[in-house]
Amino acid sequence: EYWHGGMVGKIFKDFFCDGMRPVRELSVCEAASRGGIKTTEIVAIVKNKVFGPLYKFRLVTKEITESIDLIELLLHSGENRLFKQKKQIINELAKAVNDMHNVDIYHADLHLKNILVKSDPGGGVQVYIIDLDKSKQYEKIGFQRKMKNILRLDRSVVKLRRKNQELFSKTFPVSNTDRVRFLKKYIELDSESVKPLRHYLQSYNNTHALHKLWWLVGGG
C-alpha cells in the first residue's frame, strides 16, 4: 500500500493525486529485472478513486519466500546461520548495486531495510533490491547518483548502530573492513569509478558528520 513519507504523510496519509506513480515503479522494476537485478515482482496494481482527483493505490507483489532484510539479519546476527556467509553477502550486494547502476537505475531510498537476502539451493546467497518507488532509470545515471546511493546505504548502517547502542555495546556485526570490502568489490566491477571515488571520499567524513547531526536534531 502506498503512503506518503515525512510531514506530507502526516497530512495526506495514503491519498495521492499522481495516478502514474505505481506505473512508474512497475516500469523501473521491469527494467531492473531485464538487467538481471533480483527485485520485487509486481503482479497487479490496484487503483481506487476516493473523491475528486484523489486515489489510493496498492501493489500486489509476489512474495520473496525465506528471505530476510538486512536490518533484521544484523539485529539477530548471532541467531541466523545466513550471517556466517557475511563476506558472500557483501560481495553479492556490491554486485547487485553495480548491476542496478549498469542499467542506469537510481534507487530513491537505498537502505538496509530495502535489501533482502536468502540462501540459494547451491549453498550461496541471493540479494534482492526492493522498493523501487520513486526510483528512476536515467539515460545516464552519472557518478554523483551512484555515490549518493552508496553513501545512503552506508549511512543506514551507521544509523542502525546508533539506534541500537545497547544491543551493539560490545560489537557491531558490520566492521569498517566490511564497508571497505563492499567498496572494493563495487570498484572492481566498475573500474571507471576508481579516480572519482577517491576524490569523493575525501569529503565523506564531513558529509557523514552533517548527516549524523541531522539525525540527532531531526530524529532521522
Labelled PLM ranges:
Residues 1-70, 98, 102-103, 195, ...:
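Conserved ATP-binding subdomain of kinase catalytic cores across diverse folds
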Residues 4, 112, 134:
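Short, glycine/acidic-enriched loop or turn micro-motifs at the edges of active sites
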Residues 50-54, 120-126:
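Short, solvent-exposed loop/turn segments that connect beta-strands within catalytic domains
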Residues 69-80:
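AlphaC helix of the protein kinase catalytic domain
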Residues 102-112:
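Catalytic-loop of the protein kinase fold
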Residues 111-119:
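Conserved protein-kinase catalytic-loop segment immediately C-terminal to the catalytic Asp
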Residues 124-213:
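C-lobe/activation-segment region of protein kinase-like
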